[in-house]
Each structure stands twice: as structure tokens, then as C-alpha cells.
């Protein structure tokens, strides 16, 4: 998030070596770990040799199990970092309602878990493919995501990310997230959510096409 890019094994190997060299703890956010396209599964930082020596990984139920708003997650990895995290948790927050935690456990242990997750991933991949194809037909360049449920799209020349987002909202009735909200390197892009039905995504592209912004 927001680009849909996935980390390679080589990247993580360099990261582990860097963390060991400079004695820096690594925190990996694996929220979209189950959502990979084109037959590829995103690589967990914890799969790398030495990763548990230098870092931890967060996993949330919000994306994979559509439990956004329940605020249920867990962390695994380096014991010392986990202990420090628990200390912070104890002082800053109260525990999550136990019923929600047990629901998360049931979701992880459910026999049909993998089959249901695959259905969700297939749905996102179908939307991704249809949206990217429709966007390319009108000349809108995209970074094709390898995971997540977002598309990372270039802003046409002459507009900032915010200006383009405002234009789409006001003139086409299409809401996107301006890229500069994700940091300075996001300027020049917008993020599109692929969380609505296929027909509505195609309708959004049709509305944008009528603005004649792409050559």
C-alpha cells in the first residue's frame, strides 16, 4: 500500500544484513500478505534466515478476513521486541474485547480458510485486470499491482495529485486518494481502491474517459 508492489527475497536478505550491521530493529507490516496475484504469494519477512534475530512482523485480520474496524491483529518475531511491544500495549491501550479475539482465532483455524481466502483474492485479481485493461484503453498509465486491492495510477501532465483527485471528484464523481498523501514520492500518482463491484469500476473509467484527459 499504496503501490501494490511486493518485496523480493533479495530485498529482504539485504534488509536483514543491514539490520544486523547497524543493530536496527525491523518492523514489517504484512497486512496484505495473503493477497497476491498472477499465482505469486507475497513473501513474509519472517521467512528469511535471520529475520527473527532482527525484527518482528505484524499481521491484521482487517484485509484477509474483511474484519476492518474490529482492530484485531498480532505480531510475531524477535522476543525482545515483542516484550517491548507488550509493555507499550499495556501502558497505552486496554485489551481488545475477547469475543473479537476468539473470532480471529476461529478464522485462522477454520477448515475452509484457504478456500475462502482464494475466492477473495480471485475476486480482487479479476477487478484488477478489468480495471487496468479499461484504463489502458483510454491511455491511462498504471503500475500493475502484484498484490493488495489498489491500483497506482499516473496523474496526467499539468496536474498535481491533489488537483487531479479534486477534478475526478468534482467533474466525474469518482473518488481517488492523491498520492502525495502517502509521502513526497507519491506526488504524480493517485491510488484507486478495487473494493467495489466490477461494473462500478468500469463505470468509473467510463466517466473519467469523458473528461478527455489522456492522449
Task: Name each model feature, range by range.
Residues 1-215:
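PLP-dependent class I/II
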Amino acid at each position: 500500500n499504496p503501490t501494490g508492489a511486493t518485496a523480493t527475497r533479495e530485498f529482504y536478505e539485504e534488509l536483514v544484513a543491514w539490520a544486523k550491521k547497524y543493530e536496527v530493529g525491523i518492523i514489517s507490516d504484512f497486512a496484505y500478505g495473503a493477497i497476491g496475484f498472477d499465482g505469486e504469494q507475497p513473501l513474509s519477512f519472517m521467512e528469511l534466515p535471520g529475520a527473527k534475530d532482527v525484527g518482528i512482523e505484524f499481521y491484521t485480520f482487517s484485509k484477509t478476513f474483511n474484519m476492518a474496524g474490529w482492530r484485531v491483529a498480532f505480531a510475531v518475531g524477535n522476543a525482545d521486541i515483542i516484550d517491548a511491544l507488550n509493555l507499550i500495549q499495556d501502558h497505552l491501550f486496554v485489551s481488545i474485547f475477547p469475543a473479537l479475539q476468539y473470532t480471529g482465532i476461529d478464522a485462522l483455524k477454520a477448515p475452509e480458510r484457504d478456500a475462502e481466502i482464494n475466492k477473495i483474492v480471485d475476486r480482487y485479481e479479476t477487478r484488477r485486470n478489468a480495471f487496468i485493461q479499461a484504463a489502458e484503453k483510454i491511455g491511462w498509465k498504471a503500475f500493475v499491482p502484484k498484490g493488495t486491492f489498489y491500483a497506482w495510477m499516473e496523474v496526467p501532465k499539468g496536474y498535481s495529485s491533489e488537483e487531479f483527485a479534486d477534478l475526478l471528484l468534482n467533474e466525474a464523481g469518482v473518488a481517488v486518494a492523491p498520492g502525495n498523501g502517502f509521502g513526497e514520492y507519491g506526488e504524480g500518482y493517485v491510488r484507486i481502491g478495487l473494493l467495489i463491484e466490477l461494473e462500478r469500476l468500469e463505470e468509473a473509467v467510463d466517466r473519467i474517459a469523458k473528461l478527455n484527459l489522456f492522449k
